[in-house]
Amino acid sequence: MKKRTAAMLICLAGAFATVAMADDQEFVGWMKKTGGTVGKLRKEVEAKANPDIAKDATTLVEIFKDVEGYFAKSHTDDAVAMAQAAQAVAKQLADAASSGDADAVANTMKGVMASCAGCHGAHREKLPEGGYKIK
């Protein structure tokens, strides 16, 4: 009976570790997609390509919803709030682009960048060998 219980606990621990690794890999994918999307947005804002800005800002809203869920699982409340704020500012960017308000687009893009910087400062740690890890 004790061997069976021990084996069951080992299997459960392995399953939880696998789920956590999968979540972390998903998170890295979201961050890479966010970086690429923000890079596109910078060029689109400069070119005043409002339909593209609206589309890519909406993509950010969806990514930040996933990020919110990721941090909610670990009860990292400040990161959840940051992800919610990032969703809101990305939605504002999409709305500004849809309305054709160039000044609002430029100002709101600064808000998107600030959202990224705030969360990275609080929850991203640079590794000595290169790359980053989630704090």
Predicted regions and their residues:
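Bacterial N-terminal signal peptides
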Residues: 7-15
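Short, solvent-exposed, charged loop/turn and helix-capping segments
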Residues: 63-82
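Immediate post-signal-peptide N-terminus of mature secreted/exported proteins
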Residues: 21-56
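The canonical Cys-X-X-Cys-His
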Residues: 112-123
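Inter-heme linker and motif-flanking segments adjacent to c-type heme-binding CXXCH motifs
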Residues: 100, 122-128
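Positively charged n-region of N-terminal signal peptides that target proteins for export
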Residues: 1-4
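Short cysteine/histidine-rich metal-coordination sites, predominantly Zn2+-binding motifs
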Residues: 130-135
